[in-house]
Amino acid sequence: MKKLFLLDAYALIYRAYYAFIRVPRINSKGQNTSAILGFVNTLEEVLRRENPDYIGVVFDPKGGTFRHKLYPAYKAQREETPEDIRFAIPYIKSIIEGYRIPVIEVENYEADDVIGTLAKRFAVLIPPVFEPFKTINL
């Protein structure tokens, strides 16, 4: 059976960033590259261990989603994205493109909405790096 992997970019980026929060990875220019390093390590692990036939990395869109229009207070209590993560996003997108992996971003829809919609058409496998999410029912 062919395997399709759809990765939620921001879930991985936040996970990577906070994994190094006590010992951040700082480059020679003084920039925190923790999110970049952690994201690439996870991507490499998925590619090596799972050898997917197809893979895509799904990002949340800029400017919010239909939920923000329906309910302006949606996620209003969340803290602002850390500057180090905002700094990392263009680099991560460039790296993904360097791997020749599609970057998927659908206007008005969060990454998990896109992943859930696409997953309904495929057999769903959750790689070991995502063990905590195995309880999700699609």
Language-model regions, residue ranges each:
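Conserved RecA-like ASCE P-loop NTPase motor core of nucleic-acid helicases/translocases
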Residues: P128-P132, N137-L138
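Noncatalytic, basic helical substrate-engagement surface that gates or grips nucleic-acid strands
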Residues: K2-L125, F130
